[in-house]
């Protein structure tokens, strides 16, 4: 039972801020709090010990211009810096279920051509909030090894962690249109001026919200053998009808990779993971027609460091693109940095 509860809390310290689409509307941060190895079974605690909180951050730098997957010149130096901070509050109901609320705070700085002029600005505010249910679908632990410490009259039995564990969690949820979607109104006023440089940053890239109720479906798996581990995350967003006649396409994000715990003690964990992340998103629709500059398929590689001490858990990682296949003209990511810190009460 204890190990199931631990997995509900750690098989999430990946900032799933799962891979994000071209407009950088990142997935839900689900802290993998299993690394909080010092936790005890909730059955021996008060009801409030089921609560946990987290803060996740994703920073993405967009400064490379591509047309249909090919890099082209960026004579105007257009770019977008996107920061998405997610505030997370959750409660572990029992050994199988946990509820989680995600509230994103977004800040975006940009520079783009607008006709023959240069438009600089910022956009900030509340994004689209999400309510998630996490369900442990499967969990297995090998028999724990037991040793005896002989230091007095009576030997003391010490039970060690299992050498092998495997767990799978299902993720279901609903995203609410709490973010301001007024930037989408720009789509009504866009015109091409002959001879003027083209912009790869539009209202759908800067909007704080999609204006739609969306379904969230995903899975997270965690496998460990002694100090070697493997984690995977998949998140699919089923988009509803948006506002301003603009409808975002469904998107799929995934991540995973092997890692190694250099330190794994009862109260302290430090590990390094080689992470591969990817995303797929079809083109959006505006006024019933395809918005050609919104589709993307990408793969990123990078390291991720995870650590925990008692009830605290943290992670940080960097991702660099190895393949980006986009539609039409877009400003695509140069790199992405993720981080998070979580606490189980």
Can you describe what each PLM-predicted range is?
Residues 51, 63-64, 96-101, 139-143, ...:
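Repeated loop/turn-to-beta-strand initiation elements of outer-membrane beta-barrel proteins
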Residues 49, 81-85, 123-131, 164-166, ...:
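Residues that define the transmembrane beta-barrel architecture of outer-membrane proteins
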Residues 19-65, 141-166, 180-182:
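Outer-membrane beta-barrel biogenesis signature
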Residues 59-84, 187, 202-205:
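Surface-exposed strand-loop-strand hairpins of Gram-negative outer-membrane beta-barrel proteins
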Residues 43, 55-57, 87-91, 101, ...:
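Residues on the lipid-exposed face of transmembrane beta-strands in outer-membrane beta-barrel proteins
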Residues 108-249, 308:
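Outer-membrane pore/translocation modules
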Residues 57-63, 103-109, 137, 174-180, ...:
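Transmembrane beta-strands of outer-membrane beta-barrel pores
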Residues 64-68, 72-75, 242-345:
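Outer membrane beta-barrel transmembrane domains
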